[in-house]
Amino acid sequence: FTAIITDSSSNSTTGTASGTTLAVDQTAPTISEQTVVTTPSNDTTPTFAITSNEAGAITVSQTITSPSPANAISGNTTIIFDTLAAGTYNSETVSVRDAAGNDSNTVTLTTFVIDTTAPSAFTVGSVITSGGNVVANYLNGTNTTVTVTVPIENDATLTGGTLQIQAKVTGQDFENIGSSATILEGNLGGTQSIALTDDNIEALTGYAEGTTVTFTAIITDSSSNSTTGTA
C-alpha cells in the first residue's frame, strides 16, 4: 500500500510503500489421518500421524508431547499423546492452522482402545504324557509328547492374544518351551492345550536323568498385557 497526500493548493506527494504490504493467503490447509493409533494396546502414550499440504500449528483434542512445539510440517507429521487413561477414544480430533491464520478441516481420529488390565490370575492345569508306556507324573524313554492344559478365562480381550508354555528344571529359571499359540474365541471360558515333544523337554537348561520339570504358562491379551500362571 501507499498513499497520496494533496494539500489545499492541489500540491500532492506520494508516500513511500516500504513496510506497508499484505500477503494474501485465503487458502486453508488440507489434512488427513496418515497413520492410525495402534488398537487395542496397553500404550498410554500412543502415536498417530497426519498428512498436511501446509506447515502450521497443530491443535489436538488431547494434550500432546510431540512435536514440541506443536507444529506440523508440509507432509507427514508424527504426533504423540501425553499420558492417557485406559478406555475407548472415539472422538479425538486434530486440525492445523497455517501462518496466515487459515484453519484446516478437522479430522476425527479412528477409534482406539487403551487396555492396561492384565489377564486374571490362573493355575496351570494337567500335564500329561503320551506315546509308549504312560505313567502318571513321569516322562520315560518311550514317551513322545507332553500335553500341558491351561484354563482360559471368558474374557473377550484374550481373543487374539497368546499362550506361551514355560518350563524349568529344578534349580533353573523358567524358560519358554515350544511355540506360542494364539488364543481363539472358542477357547474362552474353557481350556487350551499345548503339545510339547520330548525333544522340547530335553532341550531345557539343566535337563538330565532324574531331574524334575515344572511347568507354567504366560497368557497375553490382545493389548499385550500378560499374566504368568501359578505352576
Language-model features: locations:
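Generic structural detector for well-ordered beta-strands
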Residues: 21-23, 30-35, 49-51, 78-82, ...
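Hydrophobic beta-strand segments within extracellular beta-sandwich modules
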Residues: 1, 91-92, 215
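Extracellular beta-sheet repeat scaffolds used for adhesion and glycan interaction
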Residues: 9, 15-18, 40-43, 55-100, ...
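Conserved structural position at the C-terminal beta-strand
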Residues: 5-7, 96, 219
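Flexible, low-complexity linkers/stalks enriched in Thr/Pro that connect modular domains
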Residues: 11-12, 18-29, 34, 108-128, ...
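Intrinsically disordered, low-complexity linker/propeptide segments enriched in Ser/Thr/Gly/Pro
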Residues: 1-3, 231
